[in-house]
């Protein structure tokens, strides 16, 4: 005959746990008697053991910790063995850390992703290669000093306009045209 173990640990024998015998409304001795009479009703014998709330041994917990720590060490060793064949061309060489200053293989700062908005190289959209036909920019924003030097090469001096066609002057510029009702064509 089994005796219920009175557990003092509230994590295993808390209120509302149906498997804890000391928390049930019925008496434990009546429950065991009922179980033995139910077993005699059936012709075949099946060994059913009632669930009993017991305290865990602290020795078991300390025994499990070194094995789980060992599994983590084995996984780390396997990762290190996989990284031995990698060269320095893709990412950083194996055995180095992020704090050593190596950038990722796409040219972004460490710890960033493509979604953060860093381009792979200047002048191309994300996810494209040189073979896709995008020109790599020379490193200057458009409309910078080089564009101004091209205008100087066209041969326009400071006194002449860059636009060779005559332009109509607005009425605001000429005060005389505002007072008179006639519109005079500009003289060339």
UniProtKB/Swiss-Prot annotation:
Family in the record: Belongs to the UPF0461 family.
UniProt modified residues of type Phosphoserine: 37, 121, 180
Keyword terms: Isopeptide bond, Phosphoprotein, Ubl conjugation
Residue stretches of biased makeup (Polar residues): 94-107
Residue stretches in coiled coil: none
Glycyl lysine isopeptide (Lys-Gly) (interchain with G-Cter in SUMO2) cross-link site: 75, 184
InterPro entries in UniProt: DUF5568
Record-given protein name: UPF0461 protein C5orf24 homolog
Keyword flag Methyltransferase: no
Protein's organism: Mus musculus (Mouse)
Region entry Disordered, spans: 80-141
Bias kind Basic residues: ranges: 80-92
